[in-house]
Amino acid sequence: IDEKVLKDYSKNWKKPSVAKDLFKYDKEDADTKVRMLFQPRGAQIEALYALEQTREDGATKGLVQAATGVGKTYLAAFDSVKFKRVLFVAHREEILKQAAESFRNVRNSDDYGFFMGEVKDTDKSLIFASVASLGKKEYLNNKYFEKDYFDYIVIDEFHHAVSSQYQNIIEYFTPKFLLGLTATPERMDSKNIYELCDYNVPFEIGLKE
């Protein structure tokens, strides 16, 4: 990718409209603080460009392979801004809560919820779901979500996606684009995760690159 192209792309990258630059923490006596404005940088810009190009080429799925430290969750948040409804799937609640904060920072939106444990939000623009909950077939129906409810789906730690619960989610929903994130694409059981993303890897980078 030409460096000038990336610079131009970075300059033209726009966030969604911001209604307010202030927000209140979810504490009764918390002070109102200025929310930082987050922008993509470095390898994230290259990855965003690659993802946009692969969608222009007609791809509906893609895998980004990047080492820990590159900022894959923020990358997904930046890439999601053109899509209205987003689903982020992970296997740990801690990851989901961290991801929610990242997406909130980038999209400047409090219209998000969780689908995990006892919490079953179904009417938000951003849903952060545990695979253990959403991956159950009892939740994959029109009572909870229409097949096309989400425009953009992120599967964190995509190397786990060959498991049955991840498969249930991937097979049920019909998003405009599905993004897989991983630092470790190889699995010891030799199951092929590349097949799940149509063998499309728009971007990969190691931490030292």
Each language-model region and where it sits:
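Conserved phosphate-coupling serine/threonine residues in phosphotransfer and NTP-handling enzymes
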Residues: 68-70, 182
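Conserved nucleotide-binding/hydrolysis micro-motifs of P-loop NTPases
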Residues: 93-95, 120, 132-135, 159-160, ...
